[in-house]
Amino acid sequence: MKKILEVTGLKEQQVAPVVKGLSGLLADLQVYYSNLRGFHWNIRGAEFFVLHEQYEKMYDDLAGKIDEVAERILQLGGKPENRFSEYLKVAEVKEEHELVCAASTLKNVTDTLQIIMAKERAIAEVAGEAGDEVTVDLMIGFLSEQEKLVWMLSAYAAK
């Protein structure tokens, strides 16, 4: 059986930067996922019910995105990292464990999304240059959802 890239027509040297970008994104998404779980479990205060439920929706959605990124790395001939210790070495998103109030968790989420969205835009650009429209489409889909989420969270926080 032929290798995946032979069938798709993509060139390994052209998609190598895409794989590298996706690998960094995977690390950031995994740390973000862990942070969202912590926010869900530990949120306190008057907004508990709303944010407890919202953070659960967000980490459930993010689990699917993590899987899509890891599978795309495989489709491009790479090998996705699965060790959290390695994610922490390369992730720009940092672990959080002390945030429990609505304002601090919401700020962390929007700051994190800013990092992630910048990486997704960069990956989309590199993927476009490599002729990798599938990764471009994946990143655009993520960005579309995340931009809407940022708008909704900002509207909620502006009470």
From Swiss-Prot:
Q: Which principal EC class is assigned to this enzyme?
A: oxidoreductase
Q: Which GO terms describe its cellular component?
A: cytoplasm
Record-listed Fe cation 2 binding positions: 71
Q: Where does Fe cation 1 bind?
A: 40, 67, 71
Compartment(s)? Cytoplasm
Q: Which Pfam families match?
A: Ferritin
> Which InterPro entries does its entry note?
DPS_DNA-bd, DPS_DNA-bd_CS, Ferritin-like, Ferritin-like_SF, Ferritin_DPS_dom
Induction info: Constitutively expressed but is up-regulated by exposure to atomospheric oxygen in an OxyR-dependent manner.
Annotated Gene Ontology MF terms? ferric iron binding; oxidoreductase activity, acting on metal ions
| Subunit structure, as described in the record | Homododecamer.
Q: Which PANTHER family match?
A: GENERAL STRESS PROTEIN 20U
By sequence similarity, the record places it as follows: Belongs to the Dps family.
Q: What is this protein called?
A: DNA protection during starvation protein
Which gene holds the coding sequence for this protein? dps
